[in-house]
Amino acid sequence: MAISKNRIKYIHSLELKKKRKEENVFLAEGPKLVEDLLGHFDCRFLMGTREWLASQKNLTDIQDITEVTEEELARASLQKTPQQVLAVFEQPQYMTDPKIAEHSLCLALDDVQDPGNLGTIVRLADWFGIEDIFCSPNTADIYNPKAIQATMGGIARVRVHYTDLPELIRSLNGVPVYGTFLDGKNIYEQPLSEHGLIIMGNEGKGIGRDVEQLVNRKLYIPNLSLIHI
């Protein structure tokens, strides 16, 4: 069945944060990413090529599946080189509990602006086994399509919360609050606590003053510039 113009328009509208928020959904593209997410999020609808659909055995819970050609997928896709499958998932609802940082090591992001950078940080957090990231309200939207693609599936295992960072930090009791600075101590040479926060700042301005004054340990992360933070 061909994709309707309205559905293509809807998919393209998910580039807008307002639309994603209204619909409470996000877009993911490509076989590896979509396959990673299928077991973790409810899928609103999916469209894939005949070859990809034939390779899947666990799609029975999805009510809305459309077989498409590569050409049809290209019209709907936001990617320059579409790959076999596109899916729209429902955004998860997480309870933001700052006390998580009293029992495990978490990240906090202070106004990180670039969606690709945010997605990369989520991917790295997943790699290191960090399960929660607290973001300032002005940090990029994790459900931006560029951010989702950059997580490479990490969003399935990392919970991203948006909250007032100074308020969150003040609510913590006796936990280390690490901040990343150029004059900090090399993170690879410092023993890190198994709980607390590691704060990363804005790409150009770093950590804001209101958050910086709550940091009690300064760290330096070599090669952090690779993701422009």
Tell what function each PLM region has:
Residues M1-W52, A140:
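Boundary-proximal intrinsically disordered activation/regulatory segments immediately upstream
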Residues P98-D183:
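RNA substrate-binding interface of SAM-dependent RNA methyltransferases
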Residues T66-V88:
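Glycine/small-residue-rich loop that forms an oxyanion/phosphate-binding "nest" at active or ligand-binding sites
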Residues I227-I229:
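Conserved small/polar residues in nucleotide/adenosyl-binding loops
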Residues G179-L224:
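Active-site/ligand-binding-proximal alpha/beta "capping" segment
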Residues K32-V34, W52-L53, E72-L73, Q93, ...:
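Alpha-helix capping/helix-boundary segments
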Residues F26-A28, R44-R50, V160-H161, P176-L182, ...:
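Short, hydrophobic beta-strand segments that form beta-sheet elements in well-ordered domains
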